[in-house]
């Protein structure tokens, strides 16, 4: 789903790709970095019993390690890492359309940053 919708070659996953889940959370762009509090994404997952968190980007030594450790302990947790650019792109597309009528006569265009990573 995410690969198709965001035109990506790869979506990173931590956890069991086949696990069943009933609660999914989303932290787009840099929100999954914790907004100044590295522990925030883990606290959100625990407080709201989120099984799968869809993230923009992560701090690997905290969120990645937390979800990986939780999986190894048999907890139902997973992480889908879509990337900063891809998760914020829809907002940038909207912003270009929103700006056009506010500044008539000035060209406003959305420029697709595309998936910045190449995978070997």
Give residue ranges: language-model regions:
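Active-site catalytic microenvironments in core metabolic enzymes, especially phosphate/sugar-handling
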Residues: 1-120
């Amino acid at each position: 789903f995410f690969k198709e919708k965001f035109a990506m070659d790869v979506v990173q996953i931590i956890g069991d790709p086949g696990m069943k889940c009933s609660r999914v959370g989303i932290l787009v762009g840099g929100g999954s970095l914790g907004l100044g509090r590295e522990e925030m994404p883990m606290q959100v997952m625990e407080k709201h019993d989120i099984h799968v968190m869809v993230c923009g980007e992560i701090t690997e030594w905290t969120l990645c390690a937390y979800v990986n450790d939780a999986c190894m302990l048999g907890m139902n947790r997973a992480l889908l890492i879509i990337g900063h650019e891809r998760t914020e792109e829809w907002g940038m597309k909207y912003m270009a359309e929103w700006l056009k009528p506010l500044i008539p006569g000035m060209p406003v265009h959305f420029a697709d940053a595309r998936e910045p990573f190449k995978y070997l």
